[in-house]
């Protein structure tokens, strides 16, 4: 069980910097790009490295089973605070995201060399990394949702990065179809499809969040866990399971689980570095992280013990169906890049 510790000022700053640094880079890059496009890549790699190092500094704390919980006033009128929750789960995930993202950024300096829109590429890549780290380190559902939407917006911009829709940027084979549906997609089509399909899950997640807030009066993970009266009241009105499933809807969309998995293949229209960032490192892992973050909460609801079984049975069935579908699709897909994609989900 993680133990909350009184963090030193330096430790708390490291926790904040993990997600703030990529956003700072995203703000700087467009201005610098007006004078030197080459420098934008160096800025992106440098800030990605600093974010990853900030996460690594907190690893000893995670290995000791401790955590940092630091808050600042956000919306004082309603008593809402913004905060970071750096516990073993979030610290380990922040390191996974940070270091894989750093390696992808290093690779991108060569892969994207000479691209006419390189400044826009670096901006959205850093915005994406910052949004994902915000998801990982948020101490409440509302703040997490801002990062959630940031990841969705950045993924749309990156999947459709080559928006001029030249033939070489398409995914699939021209003329190939399955069940009468063409399997040849342009970047703009793919980006829009990913954006719309993930928004279905986002709306479900938002509904689940506010259902819980209506009973609990808070979005904070620690506050929800400390006093479970809200869960007893929701369970009495048969609303606890629907709220949990709605929250899981967000994970279904972001992690491309059945039935919202059809955007996944078409997302390969983005640059290879984008595909690596979305599929291998971050975006499809956001749903997994959300379930992991909420897991202890639902296990702790002793007054509604049946819920944990029902909730996790639904997760297991959705995951099993998705794995079967994507495995069979991967077996018959002629493109090696797409076969690798199906193994990432």
Describe the predicted segments one by one.
Residues 1-16, 27-123, 218-234, 293-295, ...:
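Transmembrane helix-loop-helix hairpins at membrane boundaries of multipass inner-membrane proteins
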Residues 21-22, 26, 46, 206, ...:
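Hydrophobic alpha-helical membrane-embedded or membrane-associated segments
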Residues 149:
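Short phosphate-coordinating micro-motif centered on Lys-Gly-acidic
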Residues 21, 25, 99, 318-321:
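Hydrophobic faces of stable alpha-helices that mediate helix-helix packing
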Residues 18-19, 26-27, 255:
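Hydrophobic alpha-helical transmembrane segments of integral membrane proteins
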Residues 103-120, 124-144, 153-344:
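Hydrophobic transmembrane alpha-helices and their helix-loop junctions in integral membrane proteins
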């Amino acid at each position: 069980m993680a133990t909350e510790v009184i963090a030193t000022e330096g430790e708390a700053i490291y926790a904040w910097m993990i997600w703030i640094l990529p956003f700072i880079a995203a703000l700087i890059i467009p201005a610098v790009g007006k004078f030197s496009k080459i420098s934008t890549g160096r800025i992106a790699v440098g800030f990605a490295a600093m974010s990853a190092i900030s996460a690594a500094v907190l690893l000893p704390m995670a290995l000791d089973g401790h955590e940092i919980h630091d808050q600042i006033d956000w919306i004082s009128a309603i008593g809402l605070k913004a905060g970071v929750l750096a516990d073993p789960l979030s610290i380990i995930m922040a390191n996974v995201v940070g270091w894989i993202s750093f390696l992808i950024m290093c690779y991108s300096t060569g892969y994207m060399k000479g691209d006419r829109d390189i400044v826009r590429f670096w901006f959205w890549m850093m915005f994406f990394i910052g949004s994902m780290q915000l998801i990982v380190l948020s101490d409440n559902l509302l703040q997490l949702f801002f990062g959630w939407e940031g990841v969705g917006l950045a993924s749309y911009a990156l999947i459709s990065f080559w928006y001029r829709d030249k033939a070489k940027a398409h995914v699939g084979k021209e003329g190939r179809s399955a069940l009468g549906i063409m399997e040849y997609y342009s970047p703009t089509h793919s980006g829009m499809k990913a954006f719309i399909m993930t928004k279905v899950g986002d709306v479900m997640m938002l509904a689940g969040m506010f259902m819980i807030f209506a009973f609990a009066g808070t979005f904070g993970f620690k506050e929800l866990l400390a006093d479970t009266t809200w869960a007893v009241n929701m369970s009495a009105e048969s609303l606890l399971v629907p709220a949990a499933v709605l929250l899981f809807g967000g994970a279904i969309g972001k992690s491309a689980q059945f039935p919202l998995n059809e955007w996944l293949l078409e997302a390969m229209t983005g640059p290879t570095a984008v595909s690596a960032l979305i599929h291998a490192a971050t975006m499809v892992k956001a749903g997994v992280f959300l379930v992991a973050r909420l897991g202890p909460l639902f296990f702790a609801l002793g007054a509604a013990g049946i819920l944990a079984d029902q909730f996790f049975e639904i997760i297991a069935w959705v995951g099993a169906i998705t794995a079967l579908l994507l495995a069979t699709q991967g077996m018959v897909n002629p493109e090696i890049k797409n076969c690798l994609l199906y193994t990432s989900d």
